Design a protein with these regions (language model features):
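Short acidic, S/G/P-rich loop/turn micro-motifs used as interaction or catalytic elements
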Residues: 56-59, 78-79, 96-101, 123-125, ...
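Bacterial C-terminal helix-turn-helix
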Residues: 1, 56, 60, 217-254
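Conserved RecA-like P-loop NTPase ATPase core
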Residues: 36, 52, 58, 64-67, ...
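Conserved P-loop NTPase "ATPase switch" module shared by AAA+ and STAND
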Residues: 75-104
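Nucleotide-binding/hydrolysis machinery
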Residues: 19-31, 38, 46-48, 55, ...
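Loop/turn-to-beta-strand initiation segments
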Residues: 87-90, 111-117
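Walker A/P-loop
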Residues: 47-75, 80
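Interdomain "pre-motor" coupling segment immediately N-terminal to P-loop NTPase/helicase cores
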Residues: 1-18
């Protein structure tokens, strides 16, 4: 019965995800993401080089993979990049701002006629951009694309179901999760995964986790007094959430 419930939950999330995700898993609900996806679709039909800009975790590599199916190489590994240029007709180059020798790169690309779709979390000078790329796509951070946040949470929830084989998180409500957008998709994914993990914790897991946490912090003369808030704060917060007032909490807690 439990597995049946999990299968239904996973299927439900799959349907929600399918509504906003194409086969590349690039979410496009906000105006900015839709425009970026339109540009990416145009790039699939031509062979020009393109640069994708944006903060860490905004989906640059995902969009690049939507444009071309090609090896991915980090620009900081310059010798590896040069070697791959010799043997591939197209490449995805991460962290283009870390290139150490742009002149040598340009010679290699022209010599082997290799196409690149590059990504960068830092701005690239206008002259370099014009020299290497015919099109530039900028993906704004998630805090400026709020329409994409919940669909991304649905996607990460589906990932969590698959990762944990449907063994946890069937009671998690995505609307109750506070999304962490500080590091875009990296922190947002962690928010969802943490919620799924915590929903599966029983008393034994919580005690074990607290024991490990406290073991790294005890050693002073007033540890019990200083660390008692770790019990008090969750009790008070959960009391307010469940009972609504200090008077009700007092009656319930005794």
């Amino acid at each position: 019965i439990i597995m049946g419930k999990m299968a239904v939950a996973a299927a439900s999330i799959t349907l929600m995800v399918a509504d906003v995700v194409d086969h590349t898993n690039y979410i496009a609900k906000s105006r900015a993401s839709i425009e970026a996806l339109k540009s990416a679709n145009l790039l699939k039909s031509v062979t020009i080089n393109a640069l994708i800009l944006g903060e860490h975790g905004v989906g640059k590599e995902t969009l690049a993979r939507h444009i071309i199916a090609a090896p991915v190489v980090d620009a900081s590994s310059f010798n590896e990049l040069l070697a791959l240029i010799e043997t591939n007709s197209s490449l995805i180059v991460k962290n283009f701002h870390k290139i150490t020798n742009y002149k040598k790169l340009k010679i290699a690309l022209d010599s082997h006629k290799t196409r690149i779709i590059a990504t960068s979390s830092l701005p690239i000078g206008e002259s370099l951009t014009d020299e290497f790329f015919s099109l530039k796509i900028t993906i704004p951070p998630l805090r400026e694309r709020m329409e994409d946040v919940f669909p991304l949470m649905e996607k990460f929830a589906f990932e969590a179901h698959m990762m944990f084989d449907g063994g946890m998180g069937d009671e998690v409500s995505l609307k109750e999760i506070v999304p962490d957008l500080s590091k875009n998709c990296y922190s947002l994914r962690r928010s969802v995964y943490n919620a799924y993990l915590m929903s599966s914790f029983g008393e034994e897991e919580i005690l074990s986790m607290m024991e490990r946490f406290l073991a790294e912090r005890i050693g002073g003369r007033n540890d019990y007094r200083d660390l008692l808030y770790l019990f008090d704060v969750p009790m008070i917060r959960s009391g307010y959430a469940k009972f609504g007032s200090q008077l009700s909490i007092s009656k319930k807690f005794g």
